[in-house]
Amino acid sequence: MAEKDHTEEPVAFAVRINIYHAAQDDPKKNTALRLSRRGFARIVTKIKFLPKRAIVLNPFSEIALSPADRERVEQFGIVGLDCSWEHAQKVMGEHVRGTSRCLPILIAGNPVNFGKLTKLTTAEAIAATLYITGFQQEAKTMLDIFPWGHTFFELNQKLLDSYVTAKDSTDIVEMQKELLTVQKREPAKCIFE
């Protein structure tokens, strides 16, 4: 399937999305830059310019993202990190404004890390955040600009739909524990379908 044309008009998007971009990879393949070009997100290159109270997608956070974070997402938006894990650790070590949350277990649908747990692109991570916090249509609209966007939802639909039913971070953690317990007993394909 050919890549969708990125010359379309930028969209008006209900949720404010900021992305800390460290310029560490090929700009032509970078999902954060494509989100910015299409009007879904604002690129930030300095930590000090990130919003104060937004949900920050922090892979090192001890608190999982859950539907309980919807109000904060709606009011203050989302901050995604577009950098290597090593750089993210350094960035998160600095004083980052906002409320840190880690994403629950999900499967990458992008062609680079297809099928790998937790190896999501910035766009996939933000779309997952939108979906889990109740902005399902916005999540699908966002990933629709990528030829592989539908694949992310096909791989993760069961997981995302279960995460949406969680009350809070504790429920998400329990769901993940159950998932990992089942995964030890059954082939991964059976669990994620």
Predicted regions and their residues:
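N-terminal, charge-rich interaction modules
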Residues: 1-75, 84-87, 93, 100, ...
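C-terminal folded domains that constitute the principal catalytic or ligand-binding module
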Residues: 94-178, 188
